[in-house]
Regions:
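Membrane-interfacial loop-to-transmembrane alpha-helix junctions, especially the N-terminal start
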Residues: 27-41, 99-107, 166-176, 208
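C-terminal transmembrane-bundle signature of multipass membrane proteins
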Residues: 148-253
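Extracellular-loop-to-transmembrane junctions of the mid-late helices
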Residues: 125-159
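The cytoplasmic-loop to transmembrane-helix boundary for the fourth helix
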Residues: 92-122
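First transmembrane helix
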Residues: 1-31, 145-162, 220-225
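Hydrophobic alpha-helical transmembrane segments of multi-pass membrane proteins
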Residues: 34-59, 173-193
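Individual alpha-helical transmembrane segments in multi-pass integral membrane proteins
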Residues: 3-14, 35-48, 60-93
Length: 253
């Protein structure tokens, strides 16, 4: 039986992949590559983490190919960082954040490598489950994943602060703060559940889902508002086509 979570993941996943495909086909019109990567990675991450498609269908398929369980969970976790990296790149460019992000991307890449190593060294590949965080012996993996999420969202918080100082409390800045703070709260809640297993009995999944929706909704809304603003400025005389890529920042001057 298809659950509500499966329907939600299917709708959001297909929507993300569809938006990514449209941006790829009409790339000359949209220009920026970061939202395209964000759409693809977020859509795939939601699909592979869905209870029915990811934990059952895809897990069985990958198990027959590789002999390892829970690869969809690992893939979904890694795609989360790809989506975050794309979002950070877009926000830094749109808000005129002058510091290069290669150090940030390097830190994220190292954290992803550690996560993969901890997964392969854990019992997760040999045990089929719907939530790998609950597997005995996987606390190190769960803790590292949550810690990596917090670090990544803190990078987003730094860019959010830069944007607030540049343009004030504009709608996209409010949405960006909602995304970063929601992400930090979600990761902190996951980290608490690792240290205190009783959190699983106190509505862990609903709380995690709600905080995840706040995080995703905030980031997606910020990207959408900034993209619309840039498109409007680019279509008019003296827009970002003439002034440069930092369309959102132009409003502060």
């Amino acid at each position: 039986m298809i659950s509500a979570a499966d329907i939600f993941c299917l709708v959001v996943g297909v929507l993300g992949l569809g938006i990514g495909a449209l941006r790829t086909v009409f790339r000359d019109r949209f220009g920026a590559i970061y939202p395209t990567i964000l759409a693809y990675s977020l859509g795939l991450a939601v699909l592979v983490r869905s209870p029915g498609i990811g934990d059952i269908v895809l897990d069985d398929a990958l198990y027959h190919l590789t002999g390892k369980h829970n690869l969809p969970d690992l893939l979904g976790h890694l795609l989360t960082f790809v989506a975050m990296g794309a979002a950070l790149g877009f926000f830094s460019r749109a808000l005129g954040y002058r510091h290069r992000l290669w150090r940030t991307y390097g830190v994220i890449a190292v954290l992803m490598a550690v996560i993969v190593a901890l997964f392969l060294d854990s019992p997760a590949p040999d045990v089929r489950t719907e939530n790998i965080v609950q597997i005995d012996g996987l606390r190190a993996y769960a803790a590292m994943f949550s810690f990596a999420l917090i670090i990544t969202h803190i990078f987003g918080l730094v860019i959010s602060r830069h944007g607030r100082m540049a343009v004030g409390w504009a709608p996209e800045i409010i949405a960006l703060y909602a995304g970063t703070c929601g992400g930090i709260a979600m990761a902190a809640h996951r980290l608490l559940a690792v240290g205190f297993p009783q959190f699983y009995d106190w509505g862990y999944s609903p709380i995690t889902w709600c905080l995840s929706l706040v995080c995703i909704g905030g980031y997606v809304t910020a990207v959408w508002v900034m993209s619309v603003t840039q498109a409007r400025e680019n279509s008019g005389p003296g827009g970002i086509a003439d002034k440069g890529a930092h369309g959102v920042l132009e409003r502060a001057h």
